[in-house]
């Protein structure tokens, strides 16, 4: 049975809250169900999670607050009202940024320099691995033993022997464009 085809009431909205945990490298998320139509980020509430489970707090004082700062369409839940909410994290006082909330600092600098028309860029790279029967996965497309040819032919390459995982990347690219990212 395909559960994506189950009809839902129009006033139900799923919002996937996404944040960076205390490792500074790992994304975490959880879904909140709103019993109302969400039209903009202003309709989203702050929410909490257990920071001790995400390397951002000690067990006795573990509530970390999620502040939605960017909302886009959810490309994974297309048959219902659904959004992704990228979030900043704050400790219990809802003022002090939690560990690895670097967006707070970047936003502060960008606001102070907004009369300067600042620019910055982000490059997203993906690294795929495949199991090779052992405990240590190898990069996708590498031979079972040894190493591939030097990168020259692969960089901005075309063809089945050079652009491995292209279908995965095209799917990710399309999902991001759909979302508005």
Feature-to-residue mapping (PLM):
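Glycine-rich, acidic/polar active-site loops that bind/position phosphate-bearing ligands
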Residues: 1-181
């Amino acid at each position: 049975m395909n559960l994506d085809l189950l009809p839902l009431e129009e006033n139900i909205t799923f919002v996937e809250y996404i944040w960076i945990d205390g490792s500074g490298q790992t994304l975490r998320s959880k879904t909140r169900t709103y019993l109302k139509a969400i039209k903009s980020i202003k309709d989203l509430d702050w929410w909490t999670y257990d920071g001790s489970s995400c390397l951002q707090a000690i067990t006795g004082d573990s509530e970390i607050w999620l502040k939605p700062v960017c909302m886009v369409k959810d490309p994974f839940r297309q048959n219902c009202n659904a959004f992704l909410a990228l979030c900043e994290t704050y400790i219990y006082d809802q003022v002090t940024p939690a560990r690895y909330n670097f967006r707070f600092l970047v936003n502060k600098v960008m606001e102070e320099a907004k009369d300067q028309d600042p620019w910055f860029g982000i490059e997203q790279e993906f690294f795929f691995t495949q199991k090779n029967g052992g405990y240590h996965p190898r990069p996708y497309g590498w031979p079972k033993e040894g190493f591939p040819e030097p990168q020259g032919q692969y960089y901005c390459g075309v063809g089945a022997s050079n652009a491995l995982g292209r279908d995965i990347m095209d799917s990710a690219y399309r999902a991001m464009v759909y979302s508005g990212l």
